[in-house]
Structure formats: C-alpha cells, structure tokens
C-alpha cells in the first residue's frame, strides 16, 4: 500500500464518470474541511495479507491524525501512486474496511468512490509535517496494549566512565540525562531516548544552510528532485579533497577500492530482502518488467562481488571500499535539511570480511580508532555511542571496557552504551559518532557495524578445506557521508563564531588558502609575483585586483574565510616581507598579524597541511576574473 497524507484546509471532489471497475455508490461528491486527506493505492503485494495492510494503514493514519490533532479523515483512492496495483476487488474491500475501522475509532470519515474519474480541489497547509508519504507493508505491527509488546523488554541506556570499568556504568533515565555535563553526550542521549529537546525549534534553518550558498559551496538544484544539490567549483574542491582523504586513509588500512552500480534489480531475492530492511525510504521504479531501486549504500554491489569471490582464511580480514557516488534515500520532504538530511549523497563505505569473533573485535577496534582520527583531523570532536545486543555484550564486555578505558585516557570523555535485549537488525553491535550542531543536536557521521546476517543472505562464504563458513562482515564509514562531514564542519564554524573566533575550514580544505591584496597599483606587480609564487609552490592563492578599497578587499577575504590574508604596501615591497593576517590565531575583534617572508609563509602553510591531500584551485588567479555563482 502506498499512501500520501496531506494535512488539508479542505478537500472537495466530484465523481464525473464511471470506469469498468467502478463501485456502485450514491456519494458522487463531497467536501471535508480541516482534515487529513489520505490518497491511497492498494498494491499487488497487499493481496498476500489484506487484513494486516488494513490494520497498519489505519494505525499510520491515526498516528498522523493524533500528531496533527485532527479528527476528520478523507480516504481517497489514487491509483497513480503505484505501478503495481492490486485487483479492483481487493482494493475496494481494503478501502471500505479502512473507512469502517476509522469510523469505529470515532473518526469522521469521507471516502471518495473507487473506480470513478473524479475532479478534486485541495488546499495543503504547507507546514513541515503537512505532506507525508508512506509505504505500508503486510508485516503486522503491534498495538501498544498488546501483551507481547508489553512484555517485550526495552532497550536500556547507560553512561560509562571508562576509567572505572564496569563500576563506571550507570543506567540513564530522563532525569539523569538532563543532568549530564557533557553537552555532546547529553544531546546524543536525548536524541536516542526520545527526550524532547529544549533548544531551538526544528523548523529554524541551521547556519550551514546559509553558509553553503553564501560561500558558493553548493545549493539545491531546482530542476531535480528535492534534496539534490549542485556543487560549485569551491564546493567541488572541498568535496574532492574529503574524498581523497578517506581514500588515502582506507588504502593505508589495506582497503581495496572497487566500483559498483548505483541501480539494482529487486527480482534478486537477496537484494530485495536487504532493501526491505530499510523500509520505504528508497527510490524504486519499474523499467520494462523489472522492479529496480537506486542504492542507499554500497552494500549491494560489494556483497554481490564478494559472493563471486573465492575467499580463503589467509585473505582475511578482506576489505573492499567504495565511495558511493551517489547513494539515494527518499527522505520525507519536510525532513530535508541542507546537507544534514538530503536524498542524494556521497557515502564512503567499506565492508570487511572477518574470520571469527576474535578477528571481528580486533578489526572493529582498529576501525573505531580510524573513525576517531577523522574527528581529530577535521577538528570536529565526536560524541560516541556504542550499541550491543545483550548477548554480544555479555560475551565481550571485558574487551568493551578496555576500549572505553583507552578512549577515556586519550579523549577524556565518557561514552553512551545502548543495550538491546534481542537482535532486531542485521548487526549485533555498532558504534556511532556524532558532531553536535549549532542547535545542540547530533549529526551522525562515522559508524562501524558488526553484521551477522548478510553473508548468509548473499551466500558469501569462506573456503577452509572442505568446509564453507559464513563470515562476519563489518560495515564502516570512516567519516559518514561527505555531505554530513561538510555540514559538521560548517556547524562547528558557526559555533566558533558564537564563541568569538573567526569561522573557517581547516587550511587543507580551504578552497582559497591565501589571498594577496595590493594597497595601490604601485604594489600590484610585487603582489602578483607573490601570488604566483604561492601557486607555484602548491598553495591555493589568488590576487585581488578588483577596483575596490583595501578595506573592502580585506572584508571580502574575511567573508571568504581565507586563512592567510597578505596586504602589500610600500613597507612590504621595500623590505621584501609579507604582512599576513592569520585567521586561526585571530579573534573576531582582534586580527593577529605576522611579518613573514614568502618562503616562511609557504613553509607555514605546508606545515599546516602536512599529511593531507592537495588539489589545485580551478578558479582564476585574478579575483576580477572569478565568476560569480550566487
């Protein structure tokens, strides 16, 4: 069942003409005000268990209506939501039953007739939750009041002081969470435990959304689907550098880069089972007689590749890596937020085949530290949450406490632990790391997951003599999506500005690392020679030759977050020195300047960027020739 839920000022329809499958009805027109309009398409797969589809659809409608605090519901058959429709007989029965169930629960219901050509008018309220789409399956959901749901143990959350080992493990509840001193862990715990955040409202635009356009990094592409971006030269450079950074890190850790398709056939049983575990937030479509999907991660291609490999124990741990350009998730339109939540994104994705539990936890630990290093390198400190099933935790808790202790020793931070009574997902353990945004909310980035299910599903085997075994597979994204990395960097820059520091990106990621500004025309020749020499030495520099005052040029360099701004006048030309404002050492109120030779400046920038990837600047050397994208 596909449904589209619209919070409406009103819905008005008129049945115009019967089709061959039209139901007989006296209700040929109708209008309802202040309502939830539910457009529905009953699908072929719903015929397997129509009762569960009815139950789940009614449950979804009621949840939405309660959130919106409305009691009027319009049930509107709308075949255009799906290309795989059920038989007319089943569709009529399902829609009628949904109407009856809602009425029994004291909702006022208007149902448009099935099988008629209808005209309709609708007015959508236009708030973030006013347009929602859902894919309803035949899998039965349970009511809150059902015994099974009541008896099922809930996940438990703990805070762990790694220095104290098991004695440092304290269970969390809402009261204790709100008293946590570590703002990052408090934010993560509140988010995971469903505790209402007391900060700024969700619909306020986060600072990074302004930055991405203001700094000519990227912007929404209006001619594409919502949540897809176009990247300008500066943004493309930043993204490419981040991709190079992850590539180098993975290869240094023995990962083997591969490339796989973005599109997969849902007729493959393993592909469909894996895709179905991620719910309805997918791009699916029909081409000829094939049902296809766009990938939401690189799992599909890598697993199919591993299935065809002849893997021996000596090959393990075996790591395949792909930068999935692109991955796709059909997030709800009202949930799309800049680079934090979007529909098309770039995901570094590594999958490691492990021999046994010992090798699995060794690799998990190695990849945990690798992920943490990305936070160090990007200067975006992470808050960390571990999640384990209770069985896995009990079997491996000594190892976990050892890792938590080492983490505390290095970073001085506690961790959150979530214990899950029974395995619900493909993994038995994972670690997630988050950057905290300007509103105090987590941006989930790196992750490592212990997958005990996919090897069997995709028939990935390790050949050991005459035996074939299904290995454990680690999923790892060392940084999280490239877009979210940039989101975290920009949100941190906003927090830095709030604290009085000039916002900036790390020097190795700054599109323009140095800008040379002449005071007057007489200084231009020397200033230009400096800019050229910087470029010749692998520094992304430009030369501000625009017809503007020196003050405005300096302000523009500040707006562009240029880390090193060199102003050249008489003194600089005569003494062969560069008066350089160093952004990282400055405050918003007081710039810090140093007198450097060209060689000293080059050495300084080289030292700042040592060990990080480099790409040249594609923009012209002369600022006057650089095109304006925004």
Swiss-Prot record:
- Which source organism? Methanococcus aeolicus (strain ATCC BAA-1280 / DSM 17508 / OCM 812 / Nankai-3)
Residues noted as binding Zn(2+) in the record, renumbered to the chain: 299, 351, 475
Kindly provide the name given to this protein in its UniProt entry: Threonine--tRNA ligase
* Class of the enzyme per the UniProt entry, highest EC level: ligase
Q: Does the keyword Nucleotide-binding apply?
A: yes
Q: What Pfam families does UniProt report for this protein, alphabetically? A: HGTP_anticodon, tRNA-synt_2b, tRNA-Thr_ED
**Got a GO cellular component term for this one?**
cytoplasm
What the entry lists under NCBIfam families is as follows: PRK03991.1, thrS
Q: Where is this region: Editing domain?
A: 1-137
Region feature (Catalytic):
207-506
Query: Subunit info?
Result: Homodimer.
GO BP terms in the entry? threonyl-tRNA aminoacylation
Species lineage: Archaea, Methanobacteriati, Methanobacteriota, Methanomada group, Methanococci
Which InterPro entries does the UniProt entry name for this protein?
Answer: aa-tRNA-synt_IIb, aa-tRNA-synth_II, aa-tRNA-synth_II/BPL/LPL, Anticodon-bd, Anticodon-bd_dom_sf, DTD-like_sf, Thr-tRNA-ligase_IIa, Threonyl-tRNA_syn_edit_dom_arc
Q: Does the keyword Methyltransferase apply?
A: no
Q: E.C. number, please?
A: 6.1.1.3
GO terms of molecular function: ATP binding; threonine-tRNA ligase activity; tRNA binding; zinc ion binding
Compartments where located: Cytoplasm
Role of this protein: Catalyzes the attachment of threonine to tRNA(Thr) in a two-step reaction: L-threonine is first activated by ATP to form Thr-AMP and then transferred to the acceptor end of tRNA(Thr). Also edits incorrectly charged L-seryl-tRNA(Thr).
Name the chemical reaction catalysed here. tRNA(Thr) + L-threonine + ATP = L-threonyl-tRNA(Thr) + AMP + diphosphate + H(+)
Record text on cofactor binding: Binds 1 zinc ion per subunit.
Q: What is the required cofactor set for this protein?
A: Zn(2+)
Similarity comment text for this entry? Belongs to the class-II aminoacyl-tRNA synthetase family.
Assigned keywords, A-Z: Aminoacyl-tRNA synthetase, ATP-binding, Cytoplasm, Ligase, Metal-binding, Nucleotide-binding, Protein biosynthesis, RNA-binding, tRNA-binding, Zinc
Domains as described in the record: The N-terminal domain is an archaea-specific tRNA-editing domain that hydrolyzes incorrectly charged L-seryl-tRNA(Thr). Catalysis of tRNA editing is performed by the charged tRNA itself.
Superkingdom as given in the UniProt entry = Archaea
């Amino acid at each position: 069942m596909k449904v589209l839920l619209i919070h409406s000022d009103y819905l008005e329809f008129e049945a115009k003409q019967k089709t061959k499958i039209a139901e007989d009805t006296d209700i040929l027109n109708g209008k309802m005000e202040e309502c939830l309009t539910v457009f529905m398409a009953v699908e072929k797969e719903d015929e397997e268990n129509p009762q569960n589809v009815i139950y789940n659809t009614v449950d979804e409608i009621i949840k939405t209506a309660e959130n919106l605090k409305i009691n009027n519901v319009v049930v509107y058959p709308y075949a255009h939501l799906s290309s795989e429709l059920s038989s007319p007989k089943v569709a009529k029965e399902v829609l009628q039953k949904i109407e009856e169930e809602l009425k029994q629960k004291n909702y006022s219901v208007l149902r448009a007739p099935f099988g008629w050509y209808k005209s309709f008018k609708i007015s959508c309220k236009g708030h973030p939750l006013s347009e929602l789409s859902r894919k309803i399956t035949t899998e039965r959901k349970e009511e809150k009041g059902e015994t099974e749901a009541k008896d099922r143990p809930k996940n438990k959350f703990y805070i762990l002081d790694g220095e104290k080992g098991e004695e440092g493990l304290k269970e969390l509840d809402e009261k204790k969470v709100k008293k946590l001193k570590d703002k990052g862990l408090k934010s993560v715990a509140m988010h995971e435990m469903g505790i209402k955040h007391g900060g700024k409202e969700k619909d306020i635009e986060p600072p990074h959304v302004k930055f991405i356009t203001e700094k000519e990094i990227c912007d929404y592409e209006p001619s594409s689907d919502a949540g897809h971006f176009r990247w300008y030269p500066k943004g493309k450079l930043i993204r490419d550098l981040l991709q190079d950074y992850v590539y180098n890190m993975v290869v240094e850790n023995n990962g083997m880069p591969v490339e796989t398709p973005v599109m997969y056939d849902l007729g493959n049983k393993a592909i469909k089972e894996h895709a179905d575990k991620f719910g309805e937030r997918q791009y699916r479509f029909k081409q000829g007689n094939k049902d296809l999907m766009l990938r939401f991660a690189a799992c599909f291609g890598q697993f199919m590749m591993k299935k065809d490999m002849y893997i021996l124990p000596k090959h393990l741990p075996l790591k395949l890596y792909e930068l999935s350009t692109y991955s796709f998730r059909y997030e709800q339109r009202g949930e799309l937020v800049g680079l934090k939540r979007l529909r098309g994104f770039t995901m570094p994705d590594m999958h490691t085949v492990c021999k046994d539990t010992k090798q699995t936890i060794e690799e998990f630990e190695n990849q945990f530290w690798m992920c943490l290093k990305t936070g160090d390198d990007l200067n975006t400190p992470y808050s960390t949450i571990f999640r384990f099933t209770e069985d896995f935790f009990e079997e491996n808790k000594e190892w976990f406490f050892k890792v938590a202790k080492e983490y505390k020793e290095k970073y001085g931070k506690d961790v959150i632990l979530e214990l899950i009574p029974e395995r619900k997902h493909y993994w038995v353990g994972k670690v997630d790391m988050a950057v905290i945004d300007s509103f105090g909310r987590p941006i989930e980035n790196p992750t490592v997951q212990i997958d005990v299910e996919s090897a069997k599903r995709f028939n990935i085997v390790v050949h050991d003599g005459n035996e074939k075994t299904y290995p454990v597979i680690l999923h790892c994204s060392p940084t999280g999506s490239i877009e979210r990395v940039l989101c975290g960097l920009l949100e941190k820059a906003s927090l830095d500005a709030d604290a009085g520091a000039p916002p900036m990106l790390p020097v190795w990621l700054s599109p323009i690392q140095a800008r040379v500004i002449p005071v007057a025309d007489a200084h231009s020749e020397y200033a230009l020679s400096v800019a050229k020499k910087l470029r010749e030495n692998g520094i992304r520099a430009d030369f501000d030759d625009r017809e503007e005052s020196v003050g405005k040029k300096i302000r523009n360099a500040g707006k562009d977050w240029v880390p090193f701004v060199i102003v050249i006048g008489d003194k600089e030309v005569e003494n062969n020195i560069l008066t350089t404002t160093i952004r990282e050492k400055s405050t918003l109120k007081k710039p810090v300047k140093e007198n450097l030779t060209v060689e000293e400046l080059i050495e300084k920038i080289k030292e700042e960027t040592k060990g990080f990837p480099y790409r040249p600047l594609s923009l012209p050397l002369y600022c006057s020739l650089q095109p304006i994208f925004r």
